[in-house]
């Protein structure tokens, strides 16, 4: 079906036939729209004639609405790009079609298409069409009179386009068009009204009379248009009226427009006439006085409200900021006008409208500074009004006092003002602090003064406003609560004061859970005491007994929101209060009933309702305290409470209506409580409660129109769309709900339920809006009915349901509908409860009453009832779970649908088919499914009834969604049906289009990933889906457009390649600023998904749209400058919908993740502009003058705000929440760069790479911006932003601290920003700063000090002084009163101690690791800490003790100190735990360092008794502070401190939480390492073997759980310290025994150590085994081939080089293994030796690899060192185990010898293996290597190396032999000398014929001579002459004569010099042999003389080079080389 898009394609329309004609035409028209803008004009002209002919054929072919729009666009584009010669013929043709007398429905589409074409032609060509427009306009206006609704709407839209195209040229027709549009503005068709409003909006741009002489009449007709209007009409007409009024006030823009300019007061007066307007018409007006304001009036009021907002938004934020007082005054005058508040319903609607006006203008258009001023203005209004009220109320003259009407008016004004003030406070957050501190404004006093207002509504509004203050500024919670308590106590005799201040206190208590810093724990006790006092004194005076009773229980109920921690201590008192408020026995209740009067019963019922409300609050908020015991103590009042429930009807009959309200409230509270309690707890009262429930449900006190409050519990959320668009989310939801619920419900309000004031509002609401008790009691009753009926005996259930059936039969009309809805709600709740508990309905007789209830509503007239009935049918089938029953119901619906012709039956039964699928998980029968789909298909094509179509399509969408693969056979037919309906259905039926959209969405889901397929069928289906989406996107209804975007989003998810982003992204950009919330939500959800995959492409397409200037792209932000990212950021300040805001943020984060690195400058600049938009630049300049470029400072106006002045509708500056998000984005960018690595954190490299590749960017180049942004955020007025700013600063310090400054070597790049950092953190240490900000600042300070950036003492001291200030606060924290919770004090104290700990750790670690150059700086840092170390150490230990106590299991709770710990109180222990969790690890490490460095030496006794050195120490654990303790010995203190540190460490390391950060684990291990480095702990753990074993076991477990190499290395270091401690202990015991027993018994000494006499090492009781397991764990993990099991049986597997971390781990493990024999007894050493030798030799075999330069790897070096330690162990010398050691070592040698023959991947290093053999030769017992076989094998290995061609190997072999030849035991050396010396001599003698060619060869010869010299000195005297002679011969052979010396190569000359030098020294040592040799060999003598002569000659010109003279010793150069490598 898809047309080729390579060029212009023509279509022969005449040849097309149905049914494919419509689709083919639509596709061709879409193809033209895409192609025409991109092809050349010449090509268009070439094909113009054919194109026009085909388009005219389409016009005459009865096109549907989508084709009509495309046809008009293409026709206009062809003429605008081609020739215009034939356009007049086309216009005439269109006019002829319009004038046609054919009025048949089939010809109507052609007429509508002609009208559309005319409009498009005139809009595109404009004045080119000359004067033809007058004929066209008159023709259209003439036809308009007789046109039907679609025609009238299309003509209005066409006239709008004509006006836009012609501009001022159409002035002659303006009046005619105006008259026609005015009449259409009140058309009965809503779509015509919308079109007329659009037409007039276009007209007003040129027709000055509209906002001049005709303004009043236009306003009047607009108000009339609002009557009976829809939501869309109200928006359109309000937009017209608001724009016209704004134009009227702004005045004429051109000289010819001479209309009078209106004043603001005149405009507001015009708008107010509509707002206050009653019903138009004489007869309808009378109803207002009798029955209240009608719905029609409310329509007008809603429209006027929207017009107010459009008017103000058109004038813009700057205008509003100047005119806030006027707007406030006018708005509040409106609400005080008697016409606006004629009755409660009217007043509620008016209040809602005024609040909406203020919120949409003051709340959205103003920046933060302007909002602060607006808040000040509102406060002034409130103050003046309260002064008036106070003055009048205090006036004793009754005639001049306020009448009731005046009080009512003032209350509504106050409610609106206070609500807006509260919303402003919530939006401003902590920024409003300066306003609240301003005494001249007196905000708090003003708001609190309203608490004494006579009206309850005003008092509630004041309370809620104060709640907003507290949520914004938590520091005021405690002070304001104190003020309320004080006023309550002082003014208990004033009913208004008791009510007002108790409400305020209750709302404050309810808001404390939103304040993370809380309030002091004692406030709960104070409030509880006050509440008890109010309840106890309530009966003293009847004048205020009701208020005191209400206030007491309200305070108790709100107290429950503080949670179990506060309530637990008051629980006993609460239970007594609850018990005392109800009679104890039924007899007491009966006695009560006989006494009292109406007022007494009113107070009693209010009190008991309050008690029940407090119980409900307790159960809701303190569930943790609901133990079985508490539940049993809570239940006794219930039977009497239920008994009183049954008495209420008789009491009401007795005392009249005065008890009605409180009895309804009592019922409501009791029902709500019973719903929360387990039904079994009141089982004996089931019947009594059920009787009352049925009575309530069958006599509801509301009109049926107000039943919407029950819909959420009855209908499925997906089905609510069938009830109308009012149930959809929209920006005007609050006001629209007031209209929706107007029939019988006066809107939700706090005065209907005082207990709602301490609850949280629903999402999207700023204030809770409980419904009146008459409605709430029905809600609670229906919920409780469902629960109780499910728990009642099955035999009683049918009777109860039958009662409902009978009750319905006994009522009629609207009353019957109310009862039916109550019954359906109850039945639905019952069925839901059964389904959730997986219970069955029960016996068959239950079905009859259920079906009776359902059948009665399924065919009723009420939409709501039908929806409820359908839902109940499905749920009934679900719980019956009987296929026969289900089939019968389905068949009954089929039959009904076949026979019934009425709309009601067809809608309800069609929906039944869908909902049955929903609750049965799809009907798994293809036959059933085919029948359902067939029926619904036919109903969906019933064009005579849009309602039937809507319901049938909705049901079809449900079936499609739930049928799974069974639906696949119906996809093609359903798609065809959808497309046909979309093409043909009129836009005037948007509900049908919405159902089509839901159906398409379900189809796309059903197709799923198959949409990616390439088959013909799938390709066709995919094309159909895309076509349907495009049609929906062009629908005028916003919900349909949103569905189209959502469907495209689904298609993109399943088949991303087939969704064209170049067309989708522009559409999304156009709708970003749509006035419709659902559309914006769909756009952002789609963008979020696109950004996850194709962020860069989306950004590019958006920028293309901005640059090309899309005609529909109208937004305040300049996308061309800011890109899509900047526009999205601006939305954060415009939007209030939480879901939409989340989508915006996620989209931005995805885009940043994708493009952040490639567009780093763009992101940083944009984020910086947001942060700069409202920053204090003076503050920035004060610390940054040297670092800020003047040009940059001058450009402080950001790109986000620079273009604001250019547009009237200017945007506000970014709010604090937006700035917080921007700062979080900065932090994420830093993290991104960190993950990317590279040059982002290296200035020199970044500058170099930037020079080479200018397009690349690096973070380090923007460091100045990062610091600046962090500073701006950290010093902002918003506390939340300060937190994020400090976090960003911390991140910058961590990432850039080590970056050097390339321009100044030896300096760091951050040094230049010291002033900025200090200025950023200093404000956080002010006394009025919240503790969380101070805690974060402490973290920054510690990181800054520890970073090493600060080097000067003065700079260090400035930062240290800040920490010192906090430390002083910590010391007196317990004695200082705080406005925050005690846990917050603990948080701040621990943060300070943690900061000091981190600085101390850094100073101590640098002392060990830094170079000498940095020692001076480090000493300064350490000295700063040392000065406070005595104080800090005591506080650190106290904090650690607290942490140890708080980590005890719950079973040990009784052992915790009753007064709490050093930094927490017992009541806030749960809240303090997280703070300890964050801080304990660094404190533990610092404490360990301090203890180990001081050697566990205590301070002097005088100091020890001081307050600071031992505030809380382990010796006082669990003791009260006041008790006097005897001084413990230093040993005891040391022991307890040691166990405190060790206990915390072991407890954590035993099983660290999965989410525990790695830093916490490493800190803990470092603490252990530091602790065990001290002498005292080392000695202690050495003596306690069980403790050492346990600690090693814990470390072993940690190794198994953590793969981090850092952790593993630390574990091994700690393990080594433990082994060393045990080693020292064993050594000390042996030394002591040696001293005690004397030398004569030395053979008995080595019995110390593990293994004793038996040699047995028991796992779990052996430190050696534990350490062995620890090391084995590491070795096997790094070298699996060590384990035969892991390596598949072979001892040696693959040998692969290890990484550096692995090498360190292996080396460290071997170091521990080598020490293990020293821990054993001789017998024990024999037990462990085989394993040790196996592991060490195995490591040697597996890691030794030959390198070209001959260097050894770390594991090899460590293995050789370990081998030496083991082989030379004293245990090998002990007689009783010497033989065993010898055998085992011989086995090891044998294994080593076999290493030469193993098959390996890498060539083994012979030198390493020879070194190992040499170690055995030199260090082991002589008998180990005395075995002839081993000797021969060893000799053979040395011979091989001597003969090696590798000089490096030869050299090292010679050196090894040198150490062997020096061995003092001749028996060891002899075999090697005999075998190897001749071979060495032969090798050296070859030098005469083959001179050395390299330094290595030269060194080999030199080393060989040294070896022979050693032999000469070691040989016996009688054999020495011959050896000397041989050596002299050899040395002389090295010499060159005088002829050869001059031309000799360098190395030959070096050998000559070496020989000559050696001869000199050696000859002097053996002169006799030398003279004898010279005398007997003239040849040698002459050679020597020639060499000497030549040498003399060479000395003359230059001094001899000493480069090789030292070669005789050889070692220095080689040693240097080895060390270097």
Swiss-Prot record:
Residue ranges of HEAT repeats: 795-836, 1059-1096
Region feature (Disordered): 1503-1528, 1989-2012
One Pfam entry name: HEAT_HEATR5A
Record key words, sorted: Repeat
Biased amino acid composition, Polar residues: 1512-1522
Domain of life, source organism: Eukaryota
InterPro entries reported in the protein's UniProt record: ARM-like, ARM-type_fold, Laa1/Sip1/HEATR5, Laa1/Sip1/HEATR5-like_HEAT
Annotated family: Belongs to the HEATR5 family.
Protein name: HEAT repeat-containing protein 5A
The organism of origin for this protein: Xenopus tropicalis
């Amino acid at each position: 079906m898809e047309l080729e898009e390579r060029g212009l394609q023509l279509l022969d329309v005449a040849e097309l036939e149905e049914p494919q004609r419509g689709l083919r035409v639509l596709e061709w028209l879409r193809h033209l729209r895409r192609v025409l803008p991109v092809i050349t004009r010449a090509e268009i002209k070439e094909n113009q004639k054919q194109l026009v002919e085909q388009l005219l054929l389409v016009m005459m072919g009865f096109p549907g609405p989508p084709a009509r729009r495309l046809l008009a666009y293409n026709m206009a584009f062809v003429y605008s790009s081609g020739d215009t010669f034939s356009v007049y013929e086309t216009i005439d043709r269109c006019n002829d079609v319009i004038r046609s007398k054919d009025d048949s429905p089939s010809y109507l589409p052609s007429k509508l298409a002609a009208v559309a074409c005319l409009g498009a032609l005139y809009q595109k060509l404009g004045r080119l069409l000359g004067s033809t427009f007058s004929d066209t306009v008159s023709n259209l206006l003439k036809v308009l009179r007789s046109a039907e609704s679609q025609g009238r709407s299309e003509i209005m839209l066409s006239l709008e386009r004509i006006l836009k195209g012609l501009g001022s040229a159409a002035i002659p027709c303006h009046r005619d068009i105006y008259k026609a549009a005015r009449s259409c503005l009140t058309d009965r068709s809503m779509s015509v009204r919308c079109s007329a409003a659009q037409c007039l909006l276009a007209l007003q741009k040129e027709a000055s009379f509209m906002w001049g002489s005709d303004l009043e009449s236009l306003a009047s007709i607009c108000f009339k248009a609002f009557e009976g209007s829809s939501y869309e009409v109200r928006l359109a007409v309000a937009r017209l009226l608001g724009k016209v009024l704004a134009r009227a006030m702004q005045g004429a823009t051109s000289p010819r427009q001479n209309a009078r300019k209106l004043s603001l007061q005149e405009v507001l007066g015009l708008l107010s006439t509509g707002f206050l307007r009653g019903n138009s018409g004489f007869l309808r007006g009378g109803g207002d006085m009798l029955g209240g304001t009608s719905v029609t009036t409310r329509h007008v009021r809603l429209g006027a409200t929207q017009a107010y907002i459009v008017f103000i938004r058109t004038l813009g934020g700057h205008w509003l900021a100047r005119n806030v007082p006027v707007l406030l005054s006018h708005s509040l005058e409106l609400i005080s006008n008697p016409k606006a508040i004629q009755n409660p319903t009217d007043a509620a609607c008016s209040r809602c409208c005024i609040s909406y006006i203020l919120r949409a203008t003051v709340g959205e258009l103003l920046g933060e500074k302007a909002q602060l001023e607006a808040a000040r203005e509102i406060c002034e209004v409130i103050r003046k009004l309260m002064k008036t009220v106070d003055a009048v109320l205090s006036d004793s003259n009754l005639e001049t006092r306020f009448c009731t009407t005046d009080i009512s008016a003032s209350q509504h004004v106050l409610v609106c003002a206070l609500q807006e003030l509260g919303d402003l406070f919530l939006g401003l957050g902590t920024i409003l602090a300066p306003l609240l501190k301003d005494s001249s404004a007196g905000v708090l006093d003003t708001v609190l003064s309203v608490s004494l207002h006579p009206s309850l509504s005003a008092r509630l509004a004041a309370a809620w406003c104060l709640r907003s203050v507290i949520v914004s500024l938590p520091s005021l919670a405690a002070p304001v609560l104190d003020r309320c308590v004080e006023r309550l106590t002082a003014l208990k005799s004033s009913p208004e004061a008791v009510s007002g201040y108790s409400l305020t206190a209750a709302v404050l208590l309810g808001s404390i859970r939103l304040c993370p810093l809380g309030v002091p724990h004692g406030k709960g006790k104070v409030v509880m005491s006050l509440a008890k006092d109010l309840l106890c004194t309530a009966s003293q005076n009847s004048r205020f007994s009701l208020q005191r009773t209400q206030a007491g229980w309200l305070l108790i109920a709100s107290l429950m929101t503080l949670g179990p921690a506060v309530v637990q201590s008051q629980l006993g008192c609460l239970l007594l209060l609850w018990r005392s408020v109800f009679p104890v026995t039924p007899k007491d209740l009966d006695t009560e009933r006989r006494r009292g009067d109406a007022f007494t019963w009113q107070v009693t019922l209010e009190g008991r309702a309050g008690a029940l409300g407090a119980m409900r609050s307790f159960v809701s908020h303190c569930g943790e305290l609901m133990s079985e015991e508490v539940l049993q103590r809570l239940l006794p009042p219930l039977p009497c409470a239920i008994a009183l429930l049954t008495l209420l009807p008789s009491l009401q009959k007795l005392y009249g209506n005065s008890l009605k309200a409180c009895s309804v409230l009592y019922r409501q509270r009791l029902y709500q409580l019973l719903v929360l309690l387990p039904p079994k707890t009141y089982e004996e009262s089931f019947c009594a409660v059920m009787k009352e429930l049925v009575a309530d449900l069958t006599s509801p006190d509301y009109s049926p129109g107000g039943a919407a409050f029950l819909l959420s519990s009855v209908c499925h959320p997906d089905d609510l769309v069938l009830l109308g668009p009012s149930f959809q989310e929209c920006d005007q939801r609050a006001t629209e709900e007031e209209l929706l619920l107007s029939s019988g419900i006066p809107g939700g309000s706090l005065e209907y339920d005082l207990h709602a004031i301490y609850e949280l509002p629903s999402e999207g609401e700023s204030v809770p809006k409980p419904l009146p008790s008459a409605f709430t009691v029905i809600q609670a009753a229906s919920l409780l009915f469902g629960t109780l009926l499910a728990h009642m005996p099955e035999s009683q259930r049918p009777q109860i349901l039958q009662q409902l059936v009978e009750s319905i039969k006994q009522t009629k009309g609207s009353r019957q509908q109310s009862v039916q809805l109550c019954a359906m709600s109850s039945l639905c709740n019952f069925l839901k409860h059964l389904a959730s508990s997986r219970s069955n309905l029960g016996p068959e007789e239950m079905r009859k009453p259920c079906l009776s209830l359902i059948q009665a509503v399924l065919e009723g007239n009420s939409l709501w009832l039908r929806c409820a009935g359908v839902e109940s049918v499905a749920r009934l089938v679900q719980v019956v779970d009987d296929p026969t029953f289900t089939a019968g119901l389905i068949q009954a619906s089929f039959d009904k649908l076949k026979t019934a012709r009425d709309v009601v039956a067809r809608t309800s039964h069609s929906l039944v088919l869908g909902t049955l699928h929903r609750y049965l998980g799809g009907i798994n029968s293809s036959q059933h499914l085919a029948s359902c789909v067939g029926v619904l298909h036919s109903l969906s094509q019933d064009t005579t009834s849009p309602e039937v179509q809507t319901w049938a399509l909705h049901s079809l969408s449900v079936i499609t969604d739930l049928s799974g693969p069974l639906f696949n056979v119906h996809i093609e037919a359903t798609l065809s049906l959808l497309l046909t309906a979309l093409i043909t259905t009129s836009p005037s039926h948007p509900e049908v289009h919405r159902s089509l959209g839901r159906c398409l969405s379900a189809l796309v889901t059903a197709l799923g990933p198959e949409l990616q397929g390439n088959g013909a069928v799938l390709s066709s289906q995919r094309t159909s889906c895309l076509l349907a989406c495009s049609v929906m996107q062009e629908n005028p209804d916003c919900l349909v457009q949103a569905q189209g975007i959502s469907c495209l989003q689904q298609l993109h998810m399943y088949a991303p390649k087939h969704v064209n982003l170049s067309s989708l992204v522009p559409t999304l950009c156009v709708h970003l600023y749509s006035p419709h919330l659902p559309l914006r939500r769909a756009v952002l959800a789609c963008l979020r998904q696109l950004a996850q995959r194709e962020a860069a492409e989306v950004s590019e397409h958006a920028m293309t749209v901005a640059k090309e200037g899309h005609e529909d792209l109208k937004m305040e932000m300049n996308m061309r400058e800011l890109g899509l990212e900047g526009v999205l950021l601006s939305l954060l300040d415009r939007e209030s919908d939480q879901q939409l805001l989340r989508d915006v943020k996620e989209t931005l984060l995805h885009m940043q993740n994708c493009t952040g690195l490639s567009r780093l400058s763009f992101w940083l600049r944009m984020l910086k502009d947001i942060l700069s938009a409202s920053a204090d630049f003076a503050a920035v300049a004060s610390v940054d003058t040297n670092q800020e470029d003047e040009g940059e400072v001058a450009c402080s106006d950001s790109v986000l705000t620079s273009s604001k002045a250019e547009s009237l509708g200017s945007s506000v500056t970014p709010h604090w929440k937006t700035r917080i998000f921007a700062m979080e984005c900065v932090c994420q960018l830093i993290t991104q760069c960190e993950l990317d690595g590279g040059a982002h954190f290296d200035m020199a490299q970044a500058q170099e790479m930037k020079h080479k590749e200018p397009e690349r960017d690096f973070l380090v180049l923007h460091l100045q911006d990062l610091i600046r942004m962090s500073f701006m955020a950290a010093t902002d007025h918003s506390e939340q932003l300060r937190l994020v700013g400090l976090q960003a600063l911390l991140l910058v310090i961590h990432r850039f601290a080590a970056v050097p400054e390339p321009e100044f070597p030896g300096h760091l790049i951050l040094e230049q920003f010291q002033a900025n950092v200090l200025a950023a953190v200093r404000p956080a240490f002010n006394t009025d700063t919240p503790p969380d900000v101070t805690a974060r600042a402490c973290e920054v300070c510690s990181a800054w000090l520890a970073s090493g950036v600060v080097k000067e003492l003065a700079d260090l001291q400035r930062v240290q002084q800040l920490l010192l200030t906090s430390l002083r606060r910590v010391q007196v924290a317990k004695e200082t009163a705080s406005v925050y919770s005690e846990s917050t004090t603990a948080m701040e104290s621990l943060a300070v101690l943690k900061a000091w700990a981190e600085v101390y750790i850094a100073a101590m670690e640098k002392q060990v690791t830094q170079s000498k150059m940095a020692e001076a700086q480090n000493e300064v840092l350490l000295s700063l800490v040392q000065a406070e170390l005595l104080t800090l150490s005591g506080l650190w230990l106290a904090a650690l003790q607290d942490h140890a106590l708080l980590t005890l299991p719950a079973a040990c709770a009784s052992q915790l100190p009753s007064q709490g710990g050093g930094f927490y109180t017992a009541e806030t222990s749960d809240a303090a735990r997280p703070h300890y969790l964050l801080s304990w690890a660094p404190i533990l490490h610092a404490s360990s360092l301090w203890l180990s460095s001081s050697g566990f030496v205590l301070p002097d006794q005088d100091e020890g008794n001081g307050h600071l050195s031992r505030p809380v120490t382990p010796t006082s654990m669990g003791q009260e502070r006041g008790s006097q303790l005897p001084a413990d010995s230093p040993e005891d203190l040391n022991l307890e401190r040691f166990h405190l540190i060790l206990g915390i460490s072991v407890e954590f390391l035993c099983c660290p939480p999965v989410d525990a950060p790695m830093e916490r684990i490493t800190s803990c291990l470092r603490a252990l390492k530091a602790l065990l480095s001290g002498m005292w702990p080392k000695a202690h753990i050495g003596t306690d073997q069980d403790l050492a074993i346990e600690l090693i076991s814990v470390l072993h477990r940690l190794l198994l759980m953590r793969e981090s190499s850092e952790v593993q290395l630390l574990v091994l270091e700690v393990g080594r310290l433990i082994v060393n401690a045990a080693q020292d202990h064993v050594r000390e015991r042996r030394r002591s025994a040696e001293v005690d027993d004397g030398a004569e018994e030395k053979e008995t000494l080595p019995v110390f150590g593990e293994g004793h006499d038996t040699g047995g090492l028991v796992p779990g009781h052996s430190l050696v085994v534990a350490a062995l397991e620890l090391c084995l764990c590491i070795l096997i993990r790094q070298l699996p081939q060590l384990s035969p099991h892991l390596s598949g049986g072979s001892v040696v597997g693959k040998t692969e080089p290890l990484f550096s971390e692995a090498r360190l781990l292996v080396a460290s493990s071997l170091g521990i293994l080598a020490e293990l024999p020293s821990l054993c007894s001789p017998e024990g050493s024999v037990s462990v030796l085989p394993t040790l030798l196996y592991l060490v030799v195995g490591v040697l075999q597996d890691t030794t690899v030959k390198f070209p330069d001959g260097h050894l790897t770390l594991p090899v070096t460590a293995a050789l060192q370990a081998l030496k330690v083991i082989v030379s162990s004293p245990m090998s010398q002990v007689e009783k185990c010497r033989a065993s050691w010898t055998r085992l070592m011989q086995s090891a040698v044998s294994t080593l010898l076999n290493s030469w023959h193993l098959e390996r991947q890498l060539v083994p290093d012979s030198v390493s293996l020879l070194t190992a053999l040499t170690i055995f030769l030199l260090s082991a017992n002589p008998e180990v290597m005395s075995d002839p076989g081993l000797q021969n094998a060893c000799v053979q290995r040395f011979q091989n190396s001597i003969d090696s061609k590798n000089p490096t190997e030869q050299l090292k072999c010679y050196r090894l032999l040198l150490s062997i030849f020096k061995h003092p035991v001749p028996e060891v050396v002899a075999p090697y000398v005999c075998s190897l010396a001749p071979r060495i001599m032969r090798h050296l003698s070859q030098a005469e014929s083959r001179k050395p060619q390299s330094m290595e060869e030269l060194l080999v010869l030199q080393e060989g001579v040294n070896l022979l010299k050693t032999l000469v000195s070691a040989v016996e005297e009688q054999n020495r002459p011959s050896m000397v002679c041989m050596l002299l011969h050899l040395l002389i052979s090295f010499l060159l004569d005088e002829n050869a010396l001059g031309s000799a190569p360098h190395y030959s000359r070096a050998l000559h010099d070496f020989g000559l030098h050696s001869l000199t020294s050696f000859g002097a040592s053996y002169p006799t042999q030398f003279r004898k040799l010279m005398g007997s060999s003239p040849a040698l003598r002459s050679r020597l003389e020639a060499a000497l002569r030549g040498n003399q000659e060479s000395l003359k010109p230059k001094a001899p080079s000493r480069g090789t003279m030292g070669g005789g010793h050889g070692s220095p150069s080689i040693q240097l080389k080895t060390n270097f490598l």
